[in-house]
């Protein structure tokens, strides 16, 4: 009798397992398929991004070599390829190099546009702030003060990589537009700043002296010195970020 009960119980368990299998095996199969598709998709995307970065690096190197060989047409084509195929880092750097070529050809509006595109290519201030700063400098002599302030003020935060240079440029712009008091205050702060580069500190001292002595006509020389300060990245980074 006990054997009969055990046999019946075993059959019931077997039937229960069969029902569970019919219910959950299809669901489990779908989950496994989705997971597999996701893994393959990630692998494919990672391979695609790595391939793009490699092509962009090669194109960027060709552009730099063409610049060294004084072949601006070839350089422009190579940098264009790097900007189109590269990740955020290479796109930003390649656009900055194109902007530099435009400046050399005195195509200032094109240079400003390219610097703006380079600044928008990455959210990393290390990559975005230099082109944004250069675009503002190119507009110093032609744009309204409101436009210069709109471009430079975000770069003046203490946490931004070019904050001291942006503060100097903003002070120069205000001095150019007759806001002498505001400009002098900014230059004094630059003189006293702890992390201000020595050349910039010296220019701030010159500006304060010029304002105090009424010889602010020396301003163009100060502006030209400021424009020569930070340059766009030129060399290929050891490990450019995959995406920004």
Enumerate the language-model features and the residues they cover.
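Long, low-complexity, intrinsically disordered segments
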Residues: 234-244
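Short extracytoplasmic
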Residues: 55-96
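Short, low-structural-confidence N-terminal segments
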Residues: 23-26, 32-46, 243-244
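N-terminal positive-inside, membrane-proximal cytosolic segments immediately preceding the first
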Residues: 1-34
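Transmembrane signal-anchor/signal-peptide helices with a preference for the extracytoplasmic
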Residues: 38-60
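Soluble extracytoplasmic domains of inner/organellar membrane proteins
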Residues: 89, 99-229, 242-244
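Flexible helix-coil transition and linker loops at the boundaries of alpha-helical arrays
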Residues: 44-48, 83-86, 120-122, 156
């Amino acid at each position: 009798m006990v054997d009969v009960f055990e046999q019946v119980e075993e059959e019931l368990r077997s039937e229960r397992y069969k029902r569970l299998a019919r219910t959950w095996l299809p669901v489990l199969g779908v989950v496994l398929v989705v997971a597999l598709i996701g893994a393959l998709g990630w692998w494919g995307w990672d391979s695609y991004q790595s391939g793009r970065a490699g092509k962009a690096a090669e194109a960027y190197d060709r552009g730099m070599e063409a610049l060294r060989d004084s072949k601006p047409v070839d350089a422009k084509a190579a940098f264009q390829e790097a900007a189109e195929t590269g990740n955020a880092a290479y796109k930003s750097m390649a656009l900055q190099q194109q902007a530099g070529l435009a400046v050399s050809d005195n195509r200032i509006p094109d240079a400003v546009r390219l610097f703006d595109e380079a600044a928008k290519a990455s959210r990393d201030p290390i990559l975005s702030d230099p082109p944004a700063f250069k675009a503002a400098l190119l507009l110093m002599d032609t744009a309204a003060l409101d436009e210069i302030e709109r471009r430079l003020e975000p770069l003046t935060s203490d946490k931004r990589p070019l904050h001291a240079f942006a503060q100097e440029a903003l002070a120069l712009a205000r001095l150019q537009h007759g806001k002498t008091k505001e400009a002098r205050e900014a230059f004094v702060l630059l003189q006293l700043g702890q992390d201000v580069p020595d050349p910039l500190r010296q220019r701030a001292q010159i500006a304060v002296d010029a304002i105090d002595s009424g010889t602010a006509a020396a301003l163009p020389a100060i502006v030209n010195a400021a424009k020569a300060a930070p340059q766009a990245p030129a060399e290929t980074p050891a490990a450019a970020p995959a995406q920004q």
